[in-house]
Amino acid sequence: MTLHRFKKIALLSALGIAAISMNVQAAERIAFIPKLVGVGFFTSGGNGAQQAGKELSVDVTYDGPTEPSVSGQVQLINNFVNQGYNAIIVSAVSPDGLCPALKRAMQRGVRVLTWDSDTKPECRSYYINQGTPAQLGGMLVDMAARQVNKDKAKVAFFYSSPTVTDQNQWVKEAKAKIAKEHPGWEIVTTQFGYNDATKSLQTAEGILKAYSDLDAIIAPDANALPAAAQAAENLKNDKVAIVGFSTPNVMRPYVERGTVKEFGLWDVVQQGKISVYVADALLKKGSMKTGDKLDIQGVGQVEVSPNSVQGYDYEADGNGIVLLPERVIFNKENIGKYDF
């Protein structure tokens, strides 16, 4: 072999190794952030996100703070940006607290999406949304109304915090629907469990003790709903209607024992999966506009809606909402069909 030919082969080999290295480095990395870890609802969403990552050959990292805090989420966002992640999908604990960190991420070319709980729309590109506030707030009231069969009733709201975006939007719509359609219902209290199982149980027991003639607890939160059910069992209160949002695996024993007649949610595994599919499409094909559709394996087709479906005034190119195809009412007849 001549020296010239040897140098040529060596050069081609080096270029090939460099190309392989570049391809490895170019693999998409997507961060999927819950409000906090250790809660079944968020774990299920993370499972859906990671399932999508496998289907798309994308590296999906699921991580969140141990307590729901702006500082904890901001630290994770900054870490993922500094590590070179291509997209961040976050369930926001605050509508505006994450905005400075998310805007910095977007300025550095990172695709920013929200899921489950939104930020202000200018702080992200797309929100993967389980349902509009009107849909979910109405769902809460309708579930309660099917059990509270009287014109005058006492109702309590119980959920995670006074600042979390999604739940406060639903509750606002639910209270408006009560005022319009059930004017005889009195909302006697609105209390919070702050995503803590022990505090949630204590708060729920406190509500039931303080309002012994309570007709319904509306608990649109994955910790608050099972806490309300457990509190009713602990206090042997079988007269209060308990409705809200949580996962079927958590609520199954309460439904089977009859403590909870029905509750609602959406397929959070699908929500996680849809979130990653949308992020992947953005990274590979660029921004989507209102009306654009995306086919998702095992789910079907989703569509980009304007921010106005969530009640926002803000609209911009490359910005919108992707609604989940459906929401689910769980009861004793159908809960066995679901495992998440």
Curated annotation (Swiss-Prot):
Signal sequence interval, chain numbering: 1-26
UniProt keywords, alphabetically: Periplasm, Signal
Listed GO MF terms: carbohydrate binding
One Pfam family recorded for the sequence: Peripla_BP_4
CDD domains: PBP1_LsrB_Quorum_Sensing (cd20003)
The UniProt record lists the keyword Signal: yes
GO cellular component, one term: outer membrane-bounded periplasmic space
Assembly notes: The complex is composed of two ATP-binding proteins (LsrA), two transmembrane proteins (LsrC and LsrD) and a solute-binding protein (LsrB).
Protein name: Autoinducer 2-binding protein LsrB
